[in-house]
Each structure stands twice: as structure tokens, then as C-alpha cells.
């Protein structure tokens, strides 16, 4: 059986490295490969022009591999990594939505690791490296993965709220939503789906629990929010993690939940040498994440660093939302001019910075002790950085130099 891997990302590399003895050697196609070579394991590294669909039995794309790419168009046996590993997948919880996927996945794993749950998918470990004998897989599941998944399904699907994101990849917001909801049609009567009330009428055989907001979700599961130490925007993530625990174990471990330590790059606070507050929220790559960050600091004047790769999303609503804040903007990245145009239309003061270091220095000239400097860019980072994490690292380095 010949397996072709599309893209040389974390997912496909893990498959090629861990399963070469069982299924390999693999043919790996990537636009960066200009000539045919072999890696150290004997896998072929090929240019997409060399793909012959008649000589391939299965094609597995990296989750973010563009659906309009010529390899996807030619593939006859396309399946996601979830489909590929479905036959050996233990019971699973899939967590999706626009914001909060990672935190909810980590919190749920924190609550359930004592029963043998392991975490993977879009966060941490690719499926090829997860223990197939674990009691439970808790998978952060992206819209990209769901787009390419047509067979696999979870026992529990926890869907956080959906807002516009990755529209240049999906083509439209409706396509994005439909990919998020696509798994429901494969779930059965023994499965459970937790989803926003707006999608409550989506056809499925699974038991549906819909919610309007974090308060409503807490009521549905008998969760006392006063016992949770996390506040918005992380409160919904915490409630969802407890809801998953309640379904599986009929317990609510508040003390264990409150011992969870938040990861870096999400509303990560630090002080400069002048005791001024800076916040690294580099992972806020869409408007709803930025709105949540702004709401957290609504009682302070906010100096917001915004911009990067906007992924084709219209951010007009975000800038309208900003009108209710005492805020100044510092535009960076490939979308600098676009951010300045949004600001002008919304009558918001904005500085043209283009690069992150200049934005930090410009803010430092204006920032007072009772104000907040916030990197919450509403855009992806790949126009200037290798990842959102690198952007956050550079931000903190710049702040520490002040």
C-alpha cells in the first residue's frame, strides 16, 4: 500500500517517522522540495508536480494544507490523520471552536489524566505519537482537520463559540461553520455533543446539550462558578472542561481545576523596569479573542498592538467594538496599512509601526503606570515570524529591554 503525505508539517512528519517500518517508505510532497531526495528513514521527498494519483492508495494532508492546492484536487483517496488512526483510536473527546480550544483541552486533560487520558491533535502531540492503549484521547481539533475528516468521530464533541477565522482558507464563514459542525452527522445515540445554542438544530443522532453562554452552560451541568478561580475569557473554558468531566465521571473537581496553570502567550502579564503593565496575548489571532482581551482591561487605557496576516477576515466589527474603549492602536505587519485604514474609519488614534520592536518602543513613550500595553494582534504571525509563540517571545524580549 502506497501512502502519500501532503505537506511537511508536524503531523505528516510524525507519521513518516513513527510508521515507516509498518507502512513506509512514504512519499512526501511539499512545495519546498525542488528535487527528489530521501530522508534518513528512506522516505521520498518530492515536488507536488511528481504526484501520480494512479500510484497512490491513500493521501494524508497536513491539517492546514490548502484545499485548493493541486495535490488536493488530484487526490482520489484523501483522508485526515483522524481517519487514518480511527481504527486504533480509543474513546475520544474532541474540542473545537474558534477561541479557547487549547486551554479547554489542557484543562480537561488536567482533570482526567488520573484515569489515563492523554492530550493531542492540534495541541502538543500528533496522533501518530499518541498511545493507542490510553484510556482516552482528548484532542484539540481544528477546522482544517475537520474539513478533511469523513469517517472518524468522537464519543464527546465539545464545541466552543464560533466567530470568523481562517476565511481565506475556508472560502467563507459559512464553510468554516459547516466544517466545525460536520462531525455531528457521524455521531450516534451513545455520543454527546455540547454546542452553542445557535447550532442546536444541527441534525445529529448524538445527545445534544446546547448553551447560550458560560452561565447557561454552568447551570446545565450544575456547576458552581463561584468555586472556579478562572475569570473571563477563561471561565467558559473551565466550565466546558468540568462539563466533560461530569459526563465521563459524574464528578466536578473544582480544587483540581483551580490548580491548573495557564500556558504562556494568552493574556500573559509582565511588568517592565518602570513597573508598567504589558500583556502578551500573541495567540489572539482573531477578532473575538481580541474582544475578550479588551474586555478584561476595559477599566484601563489600552495601548493595543494589532496587525499581521489578517487571513482575509474583515475586522470592521472589531474596530467598531473598540469605539467603546479608551484606546490607542499601534499597527504592525503586512496588514499595517489596512489596520490604519480601519482605525481612520472608526475615528481611532493609530500609529504606523510596521514591526513589533518599533511598536513596543512607541508605546513606551506614551504608557503610564495605570494603563496597559496589550499585544493582541487579531492576525496570524507568519508574515514576520515563524509562529505566534515566536512573536510573543520577541515581544517579551523587547519589553525586557526597556
Swiss-Prot record:
Query: What are the UniProt keywords, alphabetically?
Result: ATP-binding, Cell cycle, Cell division, Cell shape, Cell wall biogenesis/degradation, Cytoplasm, Ligase, Nucleotide-binding, Peptidoglycan synthesis
Q: Is Signal set as a keyword in this record?
A: no
Catalysed reaction(s) here are: UDP-N-acetyl-alpha-D-muramoyl-L-alanine + D-glutamate + ATP = UDP-N-acetyl-alpha-D-muramoyl-L-alanyl-D-glutamate + ADP + phosphate + H(+)
- Chain residues that bind ATP: 97-103
Q: Which cellular component appears as one GO term in the record?
A: cytoplasm
What Pfam families does this protein's entry cite?
A: Mur_ligase_M
Report the family membership. Belongs to the MurCDEF family.
UniProt xrefs under HAMAP family? MurD
Q: What role does this protein play? A: Cell wall formation. Catalyzes the addition of glutamate to the nucleotide precursor UDP-N-acetylmuramoyl-L-alanine (UMA).
Name recorded for this polypeptide: UDP-N-acetylmuramoylalanine--D-glutamate ligase
Organism expressing this protein natively = Campylobacter jejuni subsp. jejuni serotype O:2 (strain ATCC 700819 / NCTC 11168)
> Highest lineage ranks of the organism?
Bacteria, Pseudomonadati, Campylobacterota, Epsilonproteobacteria, Campylobacterales
